[in-house]
């Protein structure tokens, strides 16, 4: 992965030692990592930065992981969010899934598995964004054709010239 294609992560956990350890390990794996130790910090970071993937602790004081998940999804449509928890229940996993979580992993986590899931989440984000952009372009093309068929035909002929 080149420096241009680094996955940008938001890492959210109220356990500072855990947060520092996992952030350091992810940095060594060539991820860009921004950390937040509270839900409020996570939301503030998301207002200032565009993240590819977020890894969020489910159980935090103040604002719990489900509130953070919802707030992040409201701000960033294509952000994939992985929930981490030390107290997994079926109900909490279902709730997070309904709110749009990509995956729900239990602590203690397997670091190699976490890295794999982060990469899967990143790929899912790219795919969703690509599909959205593709639909958007198709809509623009349809509108362009309706409004100006000759303009679209000229544009398409230039595309054909570029492929030669």
Residue ranges and their predicted role:
Residues 123, 133-164:
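C-terminal output/effector regions of signal-responsive regulators
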Residues 109-118:
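C-terminal output helix
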């Amino acid at each position: 992965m080149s420096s241009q294609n680094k996955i940008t992560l938001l890492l959210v956990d109220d356990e500072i030692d855990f947060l520092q350890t996992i952030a350091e390990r992810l940095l060594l794996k060539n991820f860009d990592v921004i950390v937040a130790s509270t839900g409020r910090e996570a939301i503030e970071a998301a207002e200032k930065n565009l993240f590819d993937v977020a890894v969020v602790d489910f159980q935090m004081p103040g604002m719990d992981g489900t509130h953070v998940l919802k707030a992040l999804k409201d701000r960033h449509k294509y952000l994939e969010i992985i929930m981490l928890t030390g107290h997994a229940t079926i109900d909490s996993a279902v709730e997070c899934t309904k709110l749009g979580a990509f995956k729900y992993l239990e602590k203690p986590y397997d670091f190699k598995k976490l890295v794999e899931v982060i990469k899967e989440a990143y790929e899912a984000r790219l795919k969703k964004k690509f599909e959205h952009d593709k639909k958007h372009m198709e809509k623009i093309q349809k509108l362009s054709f309706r409004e100006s068929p000759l303009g679209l035909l000229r544009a398409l002929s230039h595309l054909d010239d570029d492929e030669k």
